[in-house]
Amino acid sequence: MLQRKLGKRIAELRRARKLTQEQLAEAVGCSVEFISLVERGVNAPSVAGLETFSRALKVEVKELFAFEEKKR
């Protein structure tokens, strides 16, 4: 569940910066396939990878986890 929310947040931040998955992959130093897996919540970056994603997206690491919780 957290992995899925993180992936959606990364995709949201990427789109807000008008980056393609290819551009983000190049900035992060990974494959486009990995970016796709992360954004779909199938895979998650390592702790070190979170720092790399945050630099590429020009946000603090905590901003990667700034997603809204749904009220039940």
Predicted regions and their residues:
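Short basic helix-loop element that most often maps to the first helix and adjoining turn
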Residues: K8-A27, T52
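Short, basic-rich loop-to-helix N-cap that marks the start of a DNA-contacting helix
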Residues: V42-S54, K71
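Short, charged recognition helix plus adjacent turn
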Residues: R55, E63-R72
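Recognition helix of helix-turn-helix/homeodomain-like DNA-binding domains
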Residues: G29-A44
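A detector for short, charged/polar N-terminal pre-domain segments
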Residues: M1-K5, K70-R72
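Short, conserved catalytic or interaction motifs in soluble domains
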Residues: R40, V59, E69
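Conserved hydrophobic/aromatic packing and binding residues within compact polymer-binding modules
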Residues: I10, L24-A25, I35-V38, L64
